Swiss-Prot record:
UniProtKB keywords: Acetylation, ATP-binding, Ligase, Magnesium, Metal-binding, Nucleotide-binding
Residue numbers binding CoA: 190-193, 310, 522, 583
GO function term, MF aspect, one: AMP binding
Protein's name according to its UniProt entry: Acetyl-coenzyme A synthetase
Keyword hit for Metal-binding: yes
Gene it is expressed from: acsA
Amino acid sequence: MSDLYTIDPMLAKDAHVDRAHYKTLYHESLEQPEAFWSNIAQRLEWFKTPTKIKDVSYQLEDVHIRWFEDGELNASVNCLDRHLTLRGDKTALLFEPDAPDAPSSRITYRELYERVCQLGNALRHLNIEKGDRVTIYLPMIPDAVVAILACARIGAIHSVVFGGFAPNSIADRINDCGSKLIITADEGLRGGRKIPLKANVDAALKIHGTQSVETVLVVRHTGGTINMHTPRDRWFHHVVDIQATECAPERMNAEDPLFILYTSGSTGKPKGVLHTTGGYLVYTSYTHETVFDLRENDIYWCTADIGWITGHSYIVYGPLANGATVLLFEGVPHYPTVSRFWEVIDKHHVTLFYTAPTAIRALMREGDTPVKKTSRKSLRLLGSVGEPINPEAWHWYYTIVGNGRCPIVDTWWQTETGGILITPLIGATDLKPGSVTLPFFGIRPALVDTNGQILDGPAAGNLVLLDSWPGQMRTVYGDHQRFIDTYFRTYPNTYFTGDGCRRDADGYYWITGRVDDVINISGHRIGTAEIESTLVAHPKVAEAAVVGFPHPIKGQGIYAYVTLITGETPSEALHQELLTWVRKEIGAIATPDHVQWAPNLPKTRSGKIMRRILRKIAENAPDQLGDTSTLADPSIVDLLLNERLTH
């Protein structure tokens, strides 16, 4: 197996960016960022062209990030209106339902424009104004895209909540941003199972702190029986279908908020990542076109859910701003068979395919036959996102899925970054399996040691970014101090990513995983503190500690150590009760893979739980425990190890 895949000269010849072009542009983007990004911003349609390009400070006493701050635009105009003349009849969305025997559908740019205008008008009639927050809790259906763009059209700030989250998680997000309106569906469909979306919203709205919600719009998707609470609840089609198909767009300042997306933090409470309009749209559209080497006739499929940042940036805003044809898939990779992804690729002649290592590893386990019974000849580029991809999975993806002829763009970025930061470009970058390779234009990565000293040359350390880029988050909604403390206090004058990384002799970057108390499960971040506080809220639990451990499919799994209150004894029934409790309080994604009963937890004399030691026990690495002399009771380590080793 070669560990270097050199650029295909035929690809480089036609690519948007070749090697020489990359070096020139990258140098320009660092040396003259204002001129560089001013030029790139011209890819959008502005009501008022920006002249103030960049105003950024990472100083702790004044952290602020502003790009294109005197420009005015509207995101939905850039995703819809400007395409109508030349691309009005082009397919914007290809919808592939959960059930393979259900009919797929196409929505043109003109049809999407009219539907977005209708919903925009409906929202205005329901007293939603510029700056109001709207929560979107929908399955992967076209109306989810319509809802997002309708909010953008009228200047409402959308907060999309992943359809797998439970009522408590929905309520937390409503409470934090003060949503006035929720758009949901009767039910979702996922792998043949119904997801009770409306029932979850009803349960969430009974929780204290959600009284800001005035209206719930309900999309009729499955036709399942639900409770409608009048006058709060309204059928989506009743309200929307009667509206006019023209809707005047709101003139938005580039720094006006576009959306809030909640991501897990190490302190337990999910944080509302705030992205603004101009810089985010410039960055997502530019990275989408450049990284995926977009062509006019491409059929582009990103398998992420719209409830995550990848769905926002690389299903909705980036691709539609570029006038691309986007496949929207409601289903899962293994339903009804493990060939589903590859069958969908053949059915719709997908050319660009962007998925997560978790899906690749799960499908790799099923062998080559389910892939090889399909053609996949339409594919020309493969992408990976969400977590590091191990070289074995990379090779399988390249050799079996791509037939050894499709380059892989292994992309690194975060909810907070808005778009892709480190990535290969297919005409410019030789590939190394497992490496995210080199920084995108304008991105200045560095590795630092625990003291914040910048490490030169080949090194391993914590990944920081030395300067800003237009797609960067601006603040934590309603809590700018938390923004400063989370990202800028650890290593002054830099943005701290929370990821560990190494750089090799060729300057290639290799992401090694989270270094804070956040677990990356199947590319989705969950804070350990959030799971711990949920477990401790159970009446039989005295204390809990949660860590990540290597998982062969998901990348990381959840390992929970649980101490019961006096008088309670461990049992399989209680184990199942705790799993159900977490699933109900947060969602299935946060369910622990392992629960180890712990009579006590390893703590320092000051009472701090030593998670480093718990991580090593979970990893079954007793030889890597390090110094345990600071523990108040070192004997607990042997006890936990013995219990772990009997699993």
